[in-house]
Amino acid sequence: MRTATLYRYSVPMEAGVILRHQRLKSRDGLLVKLQQGELSGWGEIAPLPEFSQETLDQAQVAAECWLQHWVSGVESDDSVLPSVAFGLSCAQAELKQTLPLSADYRKASLCTGDPDELFAVLQALPGEKVAKVKVGLYEAVRDGMIVNVLLEALPDLTLRLDANRSWSRAKADGFAKYVNPALRSRIAFLEEPCKTRAESREFAQDTGIAIAWDESVREADFQVEAEPGVAAIVIKPTLVGSLARCQQLVQQAHQAGLVAVISSSIESSLGLTQLARLAAWLTPATVPGLDTLDLMQAQVVRPWPDSPLPLITTEQLGVVWHR
């Protein structure tokens, strides 16, 4: 016999979490639990405002429709809504025990704040020093100067930078001007520096700063291929779709000689632990981009190892659908 439950969560965010144009005050999403006999599987459905194509309400409607079929014994195709496809595929994989349990809890530290604070945090990082810095929120020249200072001060540091298509080509060049050419190879990649792919490609070739595709990966005309100056693709499953789609993208990236990075869309601790398992399975040689839990004030159902944040249990969540 099959049963399914859909829970809704809302976790307050730390102050100062800004998406593209708005402050994110709470992270809201759905957790799905599939039960078949003694086996169960969980997944998270959490569209990210300003980044996902679907809203949470739309995702809930689609999830309920899929679950209604599933409990009736009908196997439906993946949802066309990426967050729904990802969450339901995780729940099915756990149910079928096809999502490996081993997890990669390493994370590229997400760095915000002034350079002095960043330096202290980065200096204290154990092991491989890989950090992610958001650029494009302030002046490009300022970003370039900060990146240069960090790379100069910490010779074993590798940076991943994310501009979210913030810059014109001129501003991107302004950034590069302040990064010493001798240090640029320690920028693992800069995600989507310019507003168009063509400008980003030109920027990479002209400056020697490697780029990665992020937003582009979710666009209909995108193809994974080796290109001069392109080092990686960033895969955010909540925005991309099912586990099968993620696996396909990773395989295509590796075949093209590109790095594939499994990355967070600010999921709850439950979703993050599943992303850590996905990373250990599909991209074991690459540190995943999962350092977003500390943006929240609580964990949900499953804890991240060693996190001091309080845990919201299943009993504390609201049930929005059950059959």
Curated annotation (Swiss-Prot):
Q: Which HAMAP family match?
A: MenC_1
Which UniProt keywords are present, listed alphabetically? Lyase, Magnesium, Menaquinone biosynthesis, Metal-binding
Q: What is the lineage of its organism?
A: Bacteria, Pseudomonadati, Pseudomonadota, Gammaproteobacteria, Enterobacterales
Report the CDD domains cross-referenced here.
OSBS
- A GO biological process this protein is involved in? menaquinone biosynthetic process
Annotated pathway: Quinol/quinone metabolism; 1,4-dihydroxy-2-naphthoate biosynthesis; 1,4-dihydroxy-2-naphthoate from chorismate: step 4/7; Quinol/quinone metabolism; menaquinone biosynthesis
**Which reaction(s) are listed as its catalytic activity?**
(1R,6R)-6-hydroxy-2-succinyl-cyclohexa-2,4-diene-1-carboxylate = 2-succinylbenzoate + H2O
Give the family this protein belongs to, as stated in its UniProt record.
Belongs to the mandelate racemase/muconate lactonizing enzyme family. MenC type 1 subfamily.
Q: Record's SMART domains?
A: MR_MLE (SM00922)
State the InterPro entries in the record: Enolase-like_C_sf, Enolase-like_N, Enolase_C-like, Mandelate_racemase_C, OSB_synthase_MenC1, OSBS_N
User: Keyword Hydrolase on this protein?
Assistant: no
Q: Which Pfam families match?
A: MenC_N, MR_MLE_C
Binding positions for Mg(2+)?
A: 162, 191, 214
Q: What is its EC number?
A: 4.2.1.113
Q: What does this protein do?
A: Converts 2-succinyl-6-hydroxy-2,4-cyclohexadiene-1-carboxylate (SHCHC) to 2-succinylbenzoate (OSB).
Source organism per entry reads Yersinia pseudotuberculosis serotype I (strain IP32953)
Q: Which cofactor does it need?
A: a divalent metal cation
Q: What is this protein called?
A: o-succinylbenzoate synthase
